């Protein structure tokens, strides 16, 4: 389990970093999305990898170590997903605007051969 | 402290939130009404900030904090909002700049696109929230609120330059957010808490292994804040962004870099202050040298700048570099000098950003500039820029304001920039000799010199050349904010002592994080009687 999670986070990070260094804005946004998936997973496993454990007790029982999963990372990751989603959507709008105004999807807003 | 009083600290967040929401409902056609509501709310925010600074400053040192437990949960479990002297001082500076920028935007810039006023209020909400929060994740949320609003404002008056700059600005900040979250995750897994006070309380007794994890987390977080405060080499976005943004927005962006410095200041002295065990002074050297590099980069950039907006941008970079260097020196005696410089340089750079737009009208007929930025948006409103009263002797006003800005930013006597710089040098020379101090001394002088050269060159070119210049029509509401900011800077020079005393008290607060920790953690949830 640890190995799978660690590898997948690593692969997501690596692909994300590769993509955001590319010159097309579409590649950049895919890279940003991959990075945010990676970081969300990373945030999620800070609560330790636990399977089949509730995040909170439904009634007042005394706290027993190991019976419950850590609820905080789950709450954090939910918020992070929502915020990441919203800001990526915002970037997408700017990307489309840039595509429409400049006629190219290069991140600099112009193709290399048009360099002054 | 009575219960009702502490709850005032929520208002600087709620007021912009509700105003922004209200403004969303009003149609763009009612421009004056929207402006009026926005301005009223921003003015209220200013008075609120004065009041809050008064409250936090007048209380004795052991109980000056305004702590509000949101949802009535005790401190490490719920999210707390904390107002202390440092936060309320920044609140005040931010509200001042917001008022100046908003008044300036009235006659032209606010009408360039839709939802300027709403975004402006949401930006203020994000700034105030980030200043007042006492929780790392909540800080992230407010940062994102602020950044989302700033994306919108940067793109306000949509043209190709702004889109291009906006894309870079957004990508850089989204990446910074990734680092921010990574940092939060690492800090949480090291300590099991995200509350500032609780983190600080756990620092001295942390075991070795989690401590290393925490250091990694803190470094990740620092990447996010240092990107915001434009440290070299993370600050390349700044000049492009600032010169693309419309002047009132650029004025607010100047304050955002200072917000990065504020967070660093707060977290550094809470987590890595003198009594944080093995972590005391963590990475101070890094901050010092990176700050020096930023200073050098800013000075070189300033020398190479031709356009006024670039001069303003690199002045902001220099100011960030100096502040980061002083933070990295980790000398408590420098703190009040640093804060004084921060206030003075923020006001001066903002005034200059607003002023440059007025100066540029000298040689280009105002309408053509306007038409250029109006290319893609609402061309039918082009003719309506007649609001406000024109002031006489425009050239004399522009010239004098320009000289004042130049003097303050370059740090020449007799204005506040000189006092700030003198203060820094005075403290620097009292420290024992070391290479980095001398480097700082030399770079500080060089930065001043390049600032003088850049400003003189620009001034000579704009005011003294024989090209066909027109005396521009200045509106009172455009000249007013510039004048206001400059008068404030000048009065900083005259009333340096009361301000200095306040800054000394802030310094004392920062050096004794114990007060902060105890007050936050000892605040109890209120028990509400059943009705």
Task: Describe the residue ranges of each PLM region.
Chain B
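Transmembrane helix-loop-helix hairpins at membrane boundaries of multipass inner-membrane proteins
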Residues: 1-10, 21-118
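Interfacial segments of multi-pass membrane proteins
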Residues: 153, 242, 321-333, 406, ...
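Short aromatic-rich membrane-water interface segments that cap or initiate transmembrane helices
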Residues: 2-3, 70-89, 202-217, 282, ...
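Alpha-helical multi-pass transmembrane bundles of energy-transducing inner-membrane proteins
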Residues: 29-31, 119-122, 126-210, 302-373
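Structural signature of hydrophobic alpha-helical transmembrane segments
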Residues: 4-15, 83-94, 136-149, 213-227, ...
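Cytoplasmic/organellar membrane-interface segments at the starts of transmembrane helices
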Residues: 368-400, 448, 452-531
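C-terminal ends of transmembrane helices
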Residues: 20-31, 98-110, 151-161, 165, ...
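Short helix-boundary/re-entrant hairpin motifs in multi-pass inner-membrane proteins
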Residues: 220-286
């Amino acid at each position: 389990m640890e190995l799978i999670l660690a590898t997948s986070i690593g692969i997501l990070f690596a692909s994300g970093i590769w993509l955001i260094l590319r010159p097309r804005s579409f590649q950049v946004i895919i890279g940003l999305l991959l990075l945010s998936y990676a970081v969300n997973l990373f945030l999620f496993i800070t609560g330790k990898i636990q399977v089949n454990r509730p995040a909170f007790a439904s009634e007042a029982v005394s706290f027993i170590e190991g019976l419950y999963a850590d609820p905080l990372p789950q709450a954090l990751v939910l918020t992070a997903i929502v915020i990441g989603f919203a800001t990526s959507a915002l970037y997408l709008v700017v990307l489309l605007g840039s595509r429409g105004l400049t006629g190219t999807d290069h991140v600099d807003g112009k193709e290399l051969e048009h360099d002054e | 402290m009575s219960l009702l009083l502490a709850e005032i600290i929520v208002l600087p967040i709620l007021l912009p939130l509700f105003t922004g929401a209200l403004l969303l409902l009003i149609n763009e056609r009612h421009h004056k009404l929207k402006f009026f509501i926005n301005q009223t709310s921003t003015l209220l925010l200013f008075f609120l900030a004065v009041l809050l600074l008064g409250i936090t400053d007048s209380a004795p040192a052991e109980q000056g904090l305004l702590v509000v437990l949101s949802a009535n949960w005790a401190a490490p479990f719920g999210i707390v909002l904390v107002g202390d002297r440092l936060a309320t001082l920044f609140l005040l500076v931010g509200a001042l700049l917001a008022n100046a920028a908003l008044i300036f935007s009235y006659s032209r810039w606010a009408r360039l696109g839709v939802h300027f006023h709403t975004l402006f209020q949401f930006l203020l909400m994000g700034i105030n929230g980030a200043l007042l929060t006492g929780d790392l994740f909540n800080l992230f949320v407010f940062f994102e609120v602020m950044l989302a609003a700033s994306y919108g404002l940067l793109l306000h008056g949509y043209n190709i330059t702004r889109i291009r700059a906006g894309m870079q600005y957004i990508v850089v900040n989204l990446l910074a957010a990734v680092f921010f979250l990574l940092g939060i995750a690492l800090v949480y897994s090291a300590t099991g808490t995200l509350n500032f006070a609780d983190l600080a309380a756990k620092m001295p007794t942390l075991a070795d292994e989690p401590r290393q994890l925490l250091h990694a987390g803190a470094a990740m977080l620092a990447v996010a804040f240092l990107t915001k405060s434009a440290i070299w080499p993370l600050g390349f976005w700044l000049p492009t962004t600032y010169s693309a943004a419309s002047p009132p927005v650029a004025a607010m962006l100047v304050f955002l870099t200072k917000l990065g410095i504020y967070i660093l200041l707060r977290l550094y002295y809470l987590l890595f202050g003198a009594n944080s065990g093995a972590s005391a002074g963590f990475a101070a050297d890094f901050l010092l040298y990176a700050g020096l590099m930023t200073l050098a980069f800013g000075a070189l950039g300033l020398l190479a700048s031709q356009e006024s907006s670039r001069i303003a941008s690199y002045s902001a970079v220099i100011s960030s570099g100096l502040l980061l260097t002083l933070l990295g020196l980790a000398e408590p005696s420098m703190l009040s000098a640093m804060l004084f410089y921060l206030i003075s340089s923020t006001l001066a750079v903002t005034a200059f950003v607003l002023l440059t737009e007025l100066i540029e009208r000298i040689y280009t007929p105002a309408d053509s500039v306007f038409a250029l930025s109006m290319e893609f948006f609402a061309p039918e409103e082009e003719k309506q820029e007649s609001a406000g009263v024109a002031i006489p002797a425009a050239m004399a006003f522009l010239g004098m304001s320009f000289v004042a800005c130049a003097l303050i930013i370059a740090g020449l006597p007799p204005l506040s920039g000189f006092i700030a710089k003198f203060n820094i040098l005075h403290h620097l020379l009292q420290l024992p000799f070391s290479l980095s101090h001398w480097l700082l001394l030399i770079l500080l002088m060089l930065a001043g010199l390049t600032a003088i050269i850049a400003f003189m060159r620009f001034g000579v070119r704009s005011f003294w050349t024989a090209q066909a210049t027109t005396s521009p029509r200045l509106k009172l509401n455009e000249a007013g904010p510039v004048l206001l900011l400059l008068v404030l800077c000048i009065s900083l020079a005259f009333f340096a002592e009361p301000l200095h005393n306040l800054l000394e008290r802030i310094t004392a607060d920062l050096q004794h994080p114990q007060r902060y920790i105890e007050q936050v953690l000892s605040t109890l949830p209120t028990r509400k009687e059943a009705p």
